[in-house]
């Protein structure tokens, strides 16, 4: 069984994306009668990323937690190393979306800890989307998680990221930092790169004078 890849781009410079070196990324949600979740990866060339589908019951060999099979299918952008999809972002069949954004200099991952769900950074997106239908379900899992500093391989070091997780009802931001795991309610449904999310939210005050209304002459 393998992940279904939907393009045939070359895998040039793939290690850069795994390291988490980006220029500017933003993930955003939008809800009308439907729920929309998307992000941009603002680079001028491909890292070998492909539109990738992971089906239900797809096996992941988690480094600390052992065998894991997805309950829900997902689709997103990933670099596929062998048959292992390294997701940058994805949405599962229940409409739960997740994306990792650059958080260099702030992300802190820890050593495995007994009694916790020890999940590597590259395992995080499929581990959440593979078994959660909503943000609320994910909150329960996140109460027991320990994001660990395990590399995918010697060629692919750990990416320094923070994440947005969203469904049609709510969004949260997840940041592993020096003091521990911070989980923020995200009322705007948007996340970009550095700085930490609380500072991003505060900086919206700089734009409070803006309006979507047409200016009056």
Language model features with spans:
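Secretory/export targeting leaders with adjacent low-complexity proregions
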Residues: 140-155, 162-164
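A contiguous strand-loop segment
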Residues: 22-117, 144, 149
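A short, charged
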Residues: 67-82, 131-136, 140, 200-217
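Extended amphipathic alpha-helical segments with heptad-repeat/coiled-coil character used for oligomerization
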Residues: 157-209
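Short, Lys/Arg-enriched N-terminal segments with co-localized hydrophobic residues
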Residues: 10-23
């Amino acid at each position: 069984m393998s992940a279904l890849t939907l393009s045939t781009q070359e895998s040039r410079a793939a290690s850069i994306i795994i390291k988490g070196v980006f220029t500017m990324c933003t993930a955003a949600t939008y809800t009308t009668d439907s729920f929309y979740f998307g992000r941009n990866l603002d680079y001028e060339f491909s890292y070998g990323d492909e539109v990738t589908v992971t089906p239900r019951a797809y096996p992941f060999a988690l480094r600390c937690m052992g065998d894991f099979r997805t309950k829900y299918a997902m689709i997103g952008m990933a670099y596929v190393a062998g048959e292992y999809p390294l997701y940058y972002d994805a949405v599962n069949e229940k409409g739960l979306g997740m994306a990792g954004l650059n958080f260099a200099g702030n992300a802190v991952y820890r050593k495995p800890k007994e009694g916790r769900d020890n999940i590597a950074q590259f395992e995080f997106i499929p581990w959440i989307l593979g078994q959660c239908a909503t943000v609320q379900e994910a909150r329960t899992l996140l109460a027991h998680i320990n994001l660990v500093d395990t590399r995918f391989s010697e060629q692919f070091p750990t990416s320094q990221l923070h994440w947005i997780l969203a469904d049609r009802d709510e969004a949260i931001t997840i940041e592993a930092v020096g003091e521990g795991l911070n989980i923020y309610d995200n009322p705007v449904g948007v996340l970009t790169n550095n700085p930490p999310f609380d500072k991003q939210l505060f900086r919206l005050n700089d734009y409070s004078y803006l309006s979507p209304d047409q200016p009056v002459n």
